[in-house]
C-alpha cells in the first residue's frame, strides 16, 4: 500500500482508498496528519532554524524545558535522542 496523503486520523493510498490510521507512526505521528496549527508551527520554525541537535539549545526548546519542569518531574527537564537515552538518564 502506497500512502499519498493524510488528514487528521485518515490516510489515503495511491488508489484513493481511505484508511483509518490506527498505527500512528512514530514520535509525533500520534498527533494526526496535517493539523493546521501543527503545520503552521512547523513552518514557522523551519523558516527560522531547522535543526541543531541536542548539544546546543534553542529558544523554543528552552521554553518547552521550562514548561515541562514547571509541571512536575522535580523541576527538571532533559532532552535526548532516544528512548534508550531517556531510560539511562532516568536510572
Describe each region flagged by the PLM.
Residues 1-10, 55, 61:
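Active-site-adjacent loop/helix segments that line or gate small-molecule/cofactor pockets in enzymes
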Residues 3-5, 11, 66, 76-77:
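Generic preference for hydrophobic/aromatic residues in regular secondary structure cores
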Residues 18-91:
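Glycine-rich loop-to-alpha-helix module at the N-terminal edge of alpha/beta enzyme cores
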Residues 6-9, 15, 26:
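Short loop/turn microsegments at loop-to-beta-strand junctions
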Amino acid at each position: 500500500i502506497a500512502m499519498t496523503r493524510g488528514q487528521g486520523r485518515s490516510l489515503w493510498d495511491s488508489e484513493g482508498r481511505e484508511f483509518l490510521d490506527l498505527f500512528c507512526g512514530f514520535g509525533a505521528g500520534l498527533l494526526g496528519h496535517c493539523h493546521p496549527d501543527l503545520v503552521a508551527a512547523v513552518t514557522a520554525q523551519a523558516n527560522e532554524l531547522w535543526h541543531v541537535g541536542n548539544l546546543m539549545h534553542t529558544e523554543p526548546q528552552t521554553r518547552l524545558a521550562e514548561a515541562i519542569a514547571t509541571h512536575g518531574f522535580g523541576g527538571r527537564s532533559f532532552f535526548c535522542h532516544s528512548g534508550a537515552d531517556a531510560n539511562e538518564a532516568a536510572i
